């Protein structure tokens, strides 16, 4: 049995910038054209896995619309759970106050501190009692932390991933979250791996991304 859908690719990247450009290239050149449930045209590559060896060098792609100030604010919201702009929810709120009851980041830190080989240092953003009833739901679903060789590694699952618009900010924020957790555990931060079930580029970004892809090929 064969399938026309573009599914499955592993990218081993050195930095966040390297990951972004290489991911865009895969989606642009090998992705499928689909119309999503909101009627938007996208280029999509399913199950795109990216391993970033050094998330702390060359963090901001020069072609990204994100600047350092905006990225720092994004990272702050992710780590602290603050919602100064009164969004319907933030990832930080889901991680630090899941369903109004659980600080999952403190749970992760405790698990890692108590057992360096634990496979239970996992945080989730999906709240079924809320997210099955609304349209605006989290794209980032799971953050899983593991200690291997005295280094803390992070693996994150995105059910849906706006690779052109959001990936640089997502990874900058995740790098700061990993750094925060590793510091609390007393170890060095390591790699970040993202699994994007639907890695896509929206049609409103196509002209810009086409120029970027031509410039880096």
UniProtKB/Swiss-Prot annotation:
GO cellular component labels: cytosol
Keywords, in A-Z order: Cytoplasm, Methyltransferase, Nucleotide biosynthesis, Transferase
Enzyme Commission code: 2.1.1.-
Primary localisation category: cytoplasm
Pathway recorded for this protein: Pyrimidine metabolism; dTTP biosynthesis
Catalytic residues (UniProt): 139
Segments forming a coiled coil: none
BP-aspect Gene Ontology terms: dTMP biosynthetic process; dTTP biosynthetic process; methylation
Keyword Kinase: no
UniProt xrefs under InterPro entries: Thymidate_synth/dCMP_Mease, Thymidate_synth/dCMP_Mease_dom, Thymidate_synth/dCMP_Mease_sf, Thymidylate_synthase_arc
Keyword Nuclease: no
Compartments, as annotated in UniProt: Cytoplasm
GO molecular function: thymidylate synthase activity
Function according to Swiss-Prot or TrEMBL: May catalyze the biosynthesis of dTMP using an unknown cosubstrate.
Family: Belongs to the thymidylate synthase family. Archaeal-type ThyA subfamily.
Assembly and interaction partners: Monomer.
Protein name as it appears in the record: Putative thymidylate synthase
Encoding gene, per UniProt annotation: thyA
